[in-house]
Amino acid sequence: MEIEEIKIEREGWLRWKNIAPLREKLSQMPKVECDVELGDVIKITGNIPRSLQEQVFETAWAMRPWRKGPFDVFGTYIDSEWKSFIKYNLLEPHFDLEGKDVADIGCNNGYYMFRMLTHHPRSLTGFDPSPLFRTQFDFINHFVQSSIVYELLGVEHVPRYGKKFDVIFCLGVLYHRSDPIAMLKWLKQGLKEGGEIFLDTFYIEGEDPVALCPGKTYSKIPNVHFVPTIKALQNWCQKAGFEYFEILATKPTTFEEQRKTEWILGESLENFLDPADPKRTVEGYPAPQRVYVRLRRKR
């Protein structure tokens, strides 16, 4: 199937029975004048009637769970599961986006892309096959009115997308793929010559080039295939054709960064770790740690 056919087919996902009522709520949201602050909290403010404030809250509440954020929309504070500014602020000193074509693979509701607007990229394109996250993005962008393009596509579509990027962000995706080297090759195919990738993934401690292959779940996440040592990750990247591999940071996931709030449904990090030993998951594996790396395609 051609990429345009896939895009058309997936736009139909917005009519799924669990998504269509949310799209209807979104379609009833009026256009209003507002101010937008693209800081740690993406804040939308303005003088609106109380009835619209209530409509905003009810619409946002219906769109739970909110994984990335936070957002403040006319006083409705969307306290997302992740304090996404912690990761964004860690990466921001390392990138230059001005005048560049930028992609965010696995963009969720677009929090990082909204933040990136302050760097004046030429274009911003998000890839994520979730119609719920796309609807959350459309809700926020209804007020932000950005030119961000959001595609209901996955990383496997990047090579066929028809546009190449100067910078690609791929945060928290690699461990969900059963063939991580193939995924890294797809990302490389989406880069212009000299382009950069900012990648983060789970890792385990160790000097050997090996990877943990969890059973049914890792930290109660069902689709984690491989958790490599940093040396194994570097070898994967080399096998995918990346000669430049720079470690930017390593960091354990903390209760400050990821926690249960009323804006999500179900459990969060505190439920995923062994209560007797928070350095282990409930399955007995090493607790989640992330490594942040920069990859570069040769000119």
From Swiss-Prot:
Pfam families named among the record's database cross-references: Methyltransf_9
SUPFAM superfamilies: S-adenosyl-L-methionine-dependent methyltransferases
InterPro entries reported for this sequence: CmoB (IPR010017), Mo5U34_MeTrfas-like (IPR027555), SAM-dependent_MTases_sf (IPR029063)
Keyword presence, tRNA processing: yes
One of the record's GO molecular function terms: transferase activity, transferring alkyl or aryl (other than methyl) groups
Domain of life: Bacteria
Binding site for carboxy-S-adenosyl-L-methionine: K68, W82, K87, G106, D128, P129, S130, V155, E156, Y175, R290
Entry function: Catalyzes carboxymethyl transfer from carboxy-S-adenosyl-L-methionine (Cx-SAM) to 5-hydroxyuridine (ho5U) to form 5-carboxymethoxyuridine (cmo5U) at position 34 in tRNAs.
Protein name, UniProt field: tRNA U34 carboxymethyltransferase
Organism: Nitratiruptor sp. (strain SB155-2)
